[in-house]
Each structure stands twice: as C-alpha cells, then as structure tokens.
C-alpha cells in the first residue's frame, strides 16, 4: 500500500515539474512557413537568371591524351641541363635526403595492367640503379651515377628520388633523362 502511494506521488511530482520545464525553454522559431505571406512570382524559365557562383563560365582544356605523356610532377617542362640537374641534386642534399637513381626500361609512366582497383598502379616502382647513395655530399657524384646509368641503358627513363631516412618517405622525385625513343612514341600516339 505504501509503495502504491509513493509511486503515485512520484508521478504527480513529475507531472507537476513538466509544465514548469516546458515554460522555461523557448520554442524553436527558426523555420517559418512562407505559406502565409503573399508573394508575386513571375514564371521565368530563362536559365541565365538562375543563381550562379561565377559571372562567366571559363572552359579549361584538359590534358591531351595523344602525344604528351606525363611522368612526374614537373614533367611538362623541358629536359633539364646538367647544371639544372646539379642544382636539383644540391637541393636534395641540402635538405638531408638520400639520393637514389632509378631506371625504367618500359614506358616510364604509371599505368594499370595487372589490377583495376583505383589506388593501384603498375609502373610506379622503378628498378634501382645501385644502392641508395647514403653519405653522398656532392651533386657531382649523383650526376656521375646518372651518366653511368645512361651509358648502360640508353633506352631507359632515369629518375632521381630523394629519400628521407628519418621519416622513411620519398620527398622528391624528378626525371633526369628521357630516351630518344620517347620522341618517336609521342609522335605516333
């Protein structure tokens, strides 16, 4: 009997507290119906009056699929001279990265042949020319290795990567040599 009295008193206290709490919180009035406001609207279906994020549309040409192949980040630039290669290698060494010379006898660019998943590309990993040049302090040593690789594989693409052995990531990569066969392939593609 006492439990039933206690429970009904508890329900009564909850019911009496509910209206007080509801009156303390203001009702949400952020969204209002526009049905009550008379609006005169003209039926204009001209697409030029639609809202836009730009004044005029600028069309940009995409990368042409024939004749111009992209290899690395700045591969659209002309081939680098030995002086420019030396400056790039100096930059690489100045940042404390380990130079590594790599070559690819194939096409020299990434492609999909063995797997069709979006993140997988064949041709991303090239063959190392020799071991990474740990302890290299002069860009002329890197240029000498590039020249040796060109003599050994004249029809191969040669690139230099800069490896940060502390973070264990590749920080820079650039094409040091493109074979003359590329000119022929570009003209027939």
Swiss-Prot record:
GO biological process: photorespiration; reductive pentose-phosphate cycle
An MF annotation (GO) of this entry: ribulose-bisphosphate carboxylase activity
Location of the transit peptide in the chain: 1-58
Compartments reported by the entry: Plastid, Chloroplast
Listed SUPFAM superfamilies: RuBisCO, small subunit
Keyword field: Calvin cycle, Carbon dioxide fixation, Chloroplast, Photorespiration, Photosynthesis, Plastid, Transit peptide
Cellular component per GO, a single term: chloroplast
Cross-referenced InterPro entries: RuBisCO_ssu (IPR024681), RuBisCO_ssu_dom (IPR000894), RuBisCO_ssu_N (IPR024680), RuBisCO_ssu_sf (IPR036385)
Signal peptide bounds: none
Chief location of this protein within or outside the cell: plastid
CDD domains, per the entry: RuBisCO_small (cd03527)
Misc remark: The basic functional RuBisCO is composed of a large chain homodimer in a 'head-to-tail' conformation. In form I RuBisCO this homodimer is arranged in a barrel-like tetramer with the small subunits forming a tetrameric 'cap' on each end of the 'barrel'.
Function as written in the Swiss-Prot or TrEMBL entry: RuBisCO catalyzes two reactions: the carboxylation of D-ribulose 1,5-bisphosphate, the primary event in carbon dioxide fixation, as well as the oxidative fragmentation of the pentose substrate. Both reactions occur simultaneously and in competition at the same active site. Although the small subunit is not catalytic it is essential for maximal activity.
Family: Belongs to the RuBisCO small chain family.
Subunit structure: Heterohexadecamer of 8 large and 8 small subunits.
Name of this chain's protein: Ribulose bisphosphate carboxylase small subunit, chloroplastic
């Amino acid at each position: 009997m006492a439990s039933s009295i206690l429970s009904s008193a508890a329900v009564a206290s909850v019911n009496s507290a509910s209206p007080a709490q509801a009156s303390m919180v203001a009702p949400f009035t952020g969204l209002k119906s526009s049905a009550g406001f008379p609006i005169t609207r003209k039926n204009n279906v001209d697409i030029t009056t639609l809202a836009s994020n730009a004044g005029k549309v600028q069309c940009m040409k995409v990368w042409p699929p024939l004749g111009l192949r992209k290899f690395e980040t700045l591969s659209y630039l002309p081939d680098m001279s030995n002086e420019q290669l030396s400056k790039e290698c100096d930059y690489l060494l100045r940042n404390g990265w380990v130079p590594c010379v790599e070559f690819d006898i194939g096409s020299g660019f990434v492609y999909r042949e063995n797997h069709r998943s979006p993140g997988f590309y064949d041709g991303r990993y090239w063959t190392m020319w020799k071991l990474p040049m740990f302890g290299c302090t002069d860009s002329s040593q890197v240029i000498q290795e590039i020249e040796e690789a060109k003599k050994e594989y004249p029809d191969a693409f040669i690139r230099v990567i800069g490896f940060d052995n502390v973070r264990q990531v590749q920080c820079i990569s650039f094409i040091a040599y493109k074979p003359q066969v590329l000119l022929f392939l570009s003209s027939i593609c």
